[in-house]
């Protein structure tokens, strides 16, 4: 076993053999603090350590000094910037997109005994730098005195108190966390760490699409995008270097480097961050509500745009449809039997060779793609196409891509570790750090969009060829950022050609929320797959993303990955979950059309019609989301952060601000339901209840799902049955009033 349970090895990643070419440098107390152009500059000396479980200062080596910059923004955000090398503080970053609400405000220094107090002009305290000697009652010389430390407490919004972990150690030489430190290897500064104190009862959430329970405390996560290969493990497609705390603050680590984040995992006293880059650029966001904090994060990294109306309808797909005739038959049957549907997605089977992505239709199976797409459009269907950001060895474009460096040249051959079912040899990754490669890629999509395609599925993007020469960035930094560059390119050309900004994306990093929308990857068609998907969606919504979807009723099957039968109850329960998600798409390794499940097909149609009735509400809540910090799928803690129970509930959620949804995820048709504080009305029966309370062991027939709505809410609904959103005129929407006369949706 490799773990040692010691900070130096397990968190800071030092080799247990302590090779001589690595060193650790610990921050000491500042020697100078001064103001420059409204920022505070702090001179911090760093002392080399003798590496061992008991760390001691290596006083034979001179200290090195670096400058910590503290910057304050007007909406309760404090920024810490510390570069170990030639790094400069800048707002120029693909990850950053400051809103008009972000304004730098000057900080002023007031020196007191043993402290520098940093305040804004109105006198609000924003940080305290403590250099006072710790109080001692000396009676023993058995152990050495603690080394100097960097002791800073932040007050980002003037209320919340967030302190660096100045003294997280057992005996002075044995550390469990360091406030700030950096590492060298072969003389090069390579890693940096920063730690904040955490409280015994503190809870955490966010960090991306995390397939974990709601409270993430006690866990350590590797922020490195990779093919998740399911939704029930530690891997994830969408890491976001941001977390929320129950102490009403959030932290955004502005980096795309591979990183490690320990939320009271290695030490229960500290939140620790380790970056593979010798740079720390950290935004600490305070707020009175969780929504305030999430909005502050979006103020830094960008707000989501509004998806088109048709995207809120039903999407139908499978892996895969193989011909225009097959698609026509399915679409015609949908209309004939009045299953409302807006999008048909073509996955891996529209190319001349299945999975061989050449961005061109198979001429035999799709002989007239423009006519085919136009025919579907007249019938109310949009077309979405699968593709990916790699060029295969035998692809038509390979010579052009290589000759022009549109794919990054490989330095050695590599094996894939992703879910490449085709066994194709991907010769290279499209280099989105190279503007000419980005324009070339946009050109490939443009010819498809000009045919009438309305959405590009930007699949993959988590993994890139790591032994390759990219024009603008080292692969170690590009790996996480790649999702943002990839999706931005597809989004921009789609909006340019069609007028609608949209992608269907699997990977993500900070800033990707600007380019909706994302889905949850390759879940299993099982109860645990459904539960894992919901957990991931909840944390994703707490990471700045407004829109999210998932494959209904799961992507793959078990025990046979491609061919096992999906159970009727899984299909039905997942349908109900999908109806109350921002976007609903059916997809998977075998047939997903409802008539293949004849026992429940009438119920599915009923729930699809409910979905279309709710589209005015979904549009209303989406407009709110793109101007605030709200997602559509909302964890209970977003509204009830003070309710400790809500920090342990990951199988219920708010849908928008008015619905409370409790999906059933078992074959027994039973579950416990928690109603948080407030007055609630059963959406389907009109029954009135008051929270906070538990409803224990509730029996829920397959045709029903526990859905509650706030008493006295007004829900806009569409009053007519339609086959697609093209038939909708939202001015005809009606107000469904959840008042004392409300008897339930089916009984209105």
Where are the model-predicted features located?
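Catalytic and substrate-binding clefts that recognize carbohydrates or anionic sugar/phosphate headgroups
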Residues: 2-13, 18-25, 44-51, 59-72, ...
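Generic recognition of flexible, low-complexity loop/linker segments
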Residues: 56-57, 67-68, 228-231, 238-240, ...
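Active-site-proximal structural scaffolding
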Residues: 63, 235-236, 244, 273-275, ...
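Conserved structural-core and active-site-/substrate-pathway-adjacent residues in large, well-folded domains
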Residues: 70, 124-125, 242, 334, ...
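Short beta-strand/loop motifs in extracellular/secreted proteins, especially
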Residues: 78, 107, 669-671
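Aromatic- and carboxylate-enriched substrate-binding clefts and catalytic-loop regions
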Residues: 83-85, 145, 155-157, 174-175, ...
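Short, well-ordered loop/turn elements at secondary-structure boundaries
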Residues: 112-114, 122, 236-239, 244-248, ...
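Catalytic core of carbohydrate-active enzymes
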Residues: 491-496, 500-501, 508-519, 529-532, ...
């Amino acid at each position: 076993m490799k773990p040692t349970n010691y900070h130096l090895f397990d968190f800071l990643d030092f080799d247990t053999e302590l090779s001589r070419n690595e060193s650790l440098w610990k921050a000491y107390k500042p020697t100078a603090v001064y103001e420059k152009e409204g920022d505070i500059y702090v001179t911090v000396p760093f002392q080399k350590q003798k590496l061992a479980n008991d760390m001691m200062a290596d006083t034979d080596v001179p200290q090195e000094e670096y400058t910590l910059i503290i910057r304050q923004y007007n909406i309760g955000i404090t920024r810490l910037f510390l570069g170990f090398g030639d790094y400069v503080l800048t707002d120029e970053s693909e990850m950053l997109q400051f809103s008009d609400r972000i304004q730098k405000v000057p900080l002023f220094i007031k020196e007191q005994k043993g402290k520098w107090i940093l305040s804004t002009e109105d006198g609000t305290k924003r940080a305290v730098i403590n250099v006072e000697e710790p109080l001692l009652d000396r009676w023993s010389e058995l152990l050495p005195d603690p080394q100097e430390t960097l002791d800073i407490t932040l007050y980002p919004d003037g209320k919340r108190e967030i302190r660096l972990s100045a003294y997280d150690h057992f005996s002075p030489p044995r550390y469990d966390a360091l406030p700030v430190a950096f590492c060298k290897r072969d003389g090069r500064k390579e890693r940096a760490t920063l730690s904040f104190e955490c409280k015994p009862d503190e809870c955490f959430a966010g960090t991306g699409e995390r397939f974990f329970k709601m409270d993430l405390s006690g866990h350590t996560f590797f922020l490195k995008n990779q093919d998740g290969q399911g939704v029930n493990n530690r891997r994830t497609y969408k890491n976001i270097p941001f977390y929320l705390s129950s102490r009403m603050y959030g932290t955004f680590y502005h980096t795309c480097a591979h990183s490690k984040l320990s939320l009271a995992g290695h030490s229960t006293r500290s939140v620790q961050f380790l970056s593979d880059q010798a740079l720390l650029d950290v935004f600490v966001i305070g707020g009175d509500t969780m929504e305030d904090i999430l909005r502050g994060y979006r103020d830094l990294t960008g707000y989501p745009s509004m998806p088109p109306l048709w995207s809120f309808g039903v999407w139908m797909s499978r892996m895969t449809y193989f011909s225009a005739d097959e698609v026509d038959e399915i679409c015609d049957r949908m209309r004939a039997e009045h299953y409302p549907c807006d999008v048909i997605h073509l996955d891996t089977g529209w190319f001349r060779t299945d999975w061989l992505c050449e961005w061109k239709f198979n001429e035999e199976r799709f002989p007239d793609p423009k006519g085919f797409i136009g025919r579907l459009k007249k019938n109310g269907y949009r077309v979405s196409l699968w593709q990916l950001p790699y060029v295969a060895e035998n692809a038509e474009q390979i010579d052009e891509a290589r000759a022009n460096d549109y794919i990054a040249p490989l330095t050695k051959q590599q094996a894939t570790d992703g879910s490449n079912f085709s066994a194709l040899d991907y010769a290279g990754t499209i280099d989105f750090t190279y503007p000419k490669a980005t324009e070339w890629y946009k050109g490939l999509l443009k010819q498809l969009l000009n045919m009438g395609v309305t959405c590009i599925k930007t699949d993959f993007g988590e993994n890139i060829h790591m032994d390759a020469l990219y024009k603008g960035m080292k692969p170690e930094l590009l790996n996480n950022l790649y999702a943002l560059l990839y999706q931005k390119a597809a989004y921009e050309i789609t909006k340019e050609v069609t007028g609608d900004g949209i992608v269907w994306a699997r990977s993500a990093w900070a800033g990707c929320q600007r380019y909706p929308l994302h889905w949850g990857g390759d879940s299993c068609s099982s109860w645990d797959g459904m539960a894992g998907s919901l957990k991931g969606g909840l944390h994703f919504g707490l990471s700045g993303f407004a829109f999210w979807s998932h494959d209904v009723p799961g992507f793959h099957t078990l025990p046979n990955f491609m061919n096992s039968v999906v159970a009727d109850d899984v299909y039905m329960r997942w349908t109900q979950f999908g109806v109350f998600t921002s976007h609903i798409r059916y997809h998977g390794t075998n047939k997903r059309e409802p008539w293949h499940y004849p026992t429940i097909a009438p119920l599915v149609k009923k729930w699809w019609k409910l979905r279309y009735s709710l589209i005015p509400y979904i549009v209303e809540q989406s407009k709110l989301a793109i101007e605030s910090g709200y997602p559509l799928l909302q964890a209970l803690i977003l509204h009830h952060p003070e309710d400790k129970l809500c920090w342990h509930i990951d199988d219920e959620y708010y849908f928008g601000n008015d619905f409370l949804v409790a999906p059933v995820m078992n074959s027994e048709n039973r579950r416990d339901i928690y109603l948080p504080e407030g007055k609630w009305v059963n959406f389907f029966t009109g029954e009135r209840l008051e929270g906070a309370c538990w409803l224990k062991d509730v029996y829920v027939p397959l045709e029903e799902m526990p859905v509650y709505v706030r008493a006295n809410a007004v829900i806009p609904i569409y009053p007519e049955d339609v086959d697609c959103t093209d038939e909708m005129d939202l001015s005809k929407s009606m107000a469904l009033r959840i008042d004392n006369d409300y008897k339930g949706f089916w009984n209105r």
